[in-house]
Design a protein with these regions (language model features):
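Short substrate-entry loop that stabilizes the transition state in hydrolases
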Residues: 23-25, 33-66
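C-terminal catalytic histidine-bearing segment of alpha/beta-hydrolase fold enzymes
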Residues: 71, 204-228
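Alpha/beta-hydrolase active-site loop
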Residues: 71-92, 112
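Gly/Ala-rich beta-loop-alpha elbow adjacent to hydrolase catalytic centers
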Residues: 102-106, 110
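Hydrolase active-site cap/lid region
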Residues: 112-168
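Short beta-strand/loop motif that positions the catalytic acidic residue
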Residues: 183, 189-191, 195
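Conserved alpha/beta-hydrolase "acid-adjacent" motif
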Residues: 196-205
């Protein structure tokens, strides 16, 4: 049987991937990690979701970069992400239920976006959030031009003065706990138990934080698996 995936453009925002037909389809906004918008991974994930009946929108939010360089995640306005989510929700092919899916820095992005929107009672809150390899705190800015693996002669210390995210014009302070309990909808959490980049304990803390507030997140831990 032939599998067809249809690309449809959200004007001024970017492409979506979805099944053929007029829809509407359940929609998902995909948030990439530090690999950046140009890497293609979020588009690959969008195609997989489209093959399962979703309208998937890979929202590229990193700054700069190209096919060889990931760019940076510095001072990204989360209000811009609220607008992107609203654009997907208003897209004629999107159904009334819209979710968020993020991996690594995209997972952080998704949790921050959902919790801050909920805390301020903003309209258009996602109906569900799914994240893989998330942190439980706000992390600092990322610039691929200066990033090196530990042990590399060009390695540089993390610049604590830079911020990855802004909200209402203010930078979000690294190490601040993400108030995931503010989000009232269903949450899916997953993490590899041998993650060498971000410890699985961060997801365990998120799960415990939610449980302490009477929530029952769906959490999955993949034995022996690394970050992605």
């Amino acid at each position: 049987m032939e599998l067809r995936i249809v690309r449809r453009l959200i004007p001024e925002w970017g492409t979506t991937y979805g099944p053929p037909g007029e829809g509407p389809f359940p929609a998902v906004m995909i948030l990439h990690g530090s690999e950046g918008a140009w890497s293609g991974w979020s588009h690959r994930n969008a195609v997989i979701l489209a093959a399962h009946g979703f309208l998937a929108f890979p929202f590229g939010y990193s700054s700069g970069g190209n096919a060889w360089n990931a760019g940076s995640i510095v001072d990204h306005s989360l209000e811009r992400s609220v607008e992107a989510l609203a654009a997907l929700r208003a897209f004629p092919y999107a159904g009334p239920r819209v979710g968020l899916y993020g991996v690594s820095r995209g997972a952080e992005h998704a949790l921050l976006l959902a919790s801050l929107m909920a805390k301020e009672n903003k309209t258009g809150l996602p109906e569900a959030v799914a994240v893989h390899s998330p942190p439980d705190v706000v992390c600092g800015a990322f610039d691929s031009r200066s990033y090196r693996d530990s042990g590399d002669p060009g390695w540089q210390a993390w610049d604590a003065s830079k911020r990855a995210w802004t909200w209402r014009g203010e930078g979000l302070m690294p190490t601040t706990p993400i108030e995931v309990e503010q989000y009232p909808g269903p949450l899916f959490l997953s993490h590899g138990t041998r993650d060498r980049m971000w410890s699985v304990e961060m997801t365990r803390r998120l799960e415990k934080r939610l449980q302490a507030h009477g929530r029952k997140p769906e959490a999955h831990y993949y034995e022996g698996e690394d970050h992605l």
